[in-house]
Amino acid sequence: MKKAKAIFLFILIVSGFLLVACQANYIRDVQGGTVAPSSSSELTGIAVQ
């Protein structure tokens, strides 16, 4: 039971980290920050100027 809890916790941390990373990338795309027309903004359908 303890091993399953540890695996669940690990997955939770990893997914949380991925969510934060994607969110930061999305916000940077929307604000038109350092990465100009990025591939992720094209994939999500945001108009690239």
Swiss-Prot record:
Residues anchoring lipid (S-diacylglycerol cysteine): C22
Topology term for the membrane: Lipid-anchor
UniProt keyword terms in alphabetical order: Cell outer membrane, Lipoprotein, Membrane, Palmitate, Plasmid, Signal
Location in the cell: Cell outer membrane
GO CC annotations, alphabetized: cell outer membrane
Keyword Transmembrane helix: no
Span of the signal peptide: 1-21
GO biological process, one term: cytolysis
One Pfam family recorded for the sequence: Lysis_col
InterPro entries named among the record's database cross-references: Lysis_col
Main location: membrane
Domain of life of the organism encoding this protein: Bacteria
Lipidation (N-palmitoyl cysteine): C22
Additional detail: Plasmid Clo DF13 originates from Enterobacter cloacae but is stably maintained in and studied mostly from E.coli.
Physiological role: Lysis proteins are required for both colicin release and partial cell lysis.
Name this polypeptide is given: Lysis protein
Annotated source species: Escherichia coli
